[in-house]
């Protein structure tokens, strides 16, 4: 079952991206390095509630 998750920047805490994940394959929280337009650089983004 795929669910929508929100990714937030770890530096400025802004919620920048929405993506989907398969809970069966990825039971843990997702971490991705993505571009944050407020920080102006690529930063680590983590899944939020």
From Swiss-Prot:
Pfam families: Ribosomal_L33. GO terms for cellular component: cytoplasm; ribonucleoprotein complex; ribosome. InterPro entries: Ribosomal_bL33, Ribosomal_bL33_CS, Ribosomal_bL33_sf, Ribosomal_zn-bd. Keywords: Ribonucleoprotein, Ribosomal protein. One of its GO terms (biological process) is translation. GO terms for molecular function: structural constituent of ribosome. NCBIfam families: PRK00504.1, PRK00595.1, rpmG_bact. Belongs to the bacterial ribosomal protein bL33 family. This is Large ribosomal subunit protein bL33. The gene is rpmG.
């Amino acid at each position: 079952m795929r669910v929508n998750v929100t990714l937030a920047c770890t530096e400025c805490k802004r919620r920048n991206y929405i993506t989907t994940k398969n809970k069966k394959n990825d039971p843990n929280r997702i971490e991705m390095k993505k571009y944050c337009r407020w920080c102006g650089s690529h930063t680590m983004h983590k899944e939020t509630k």
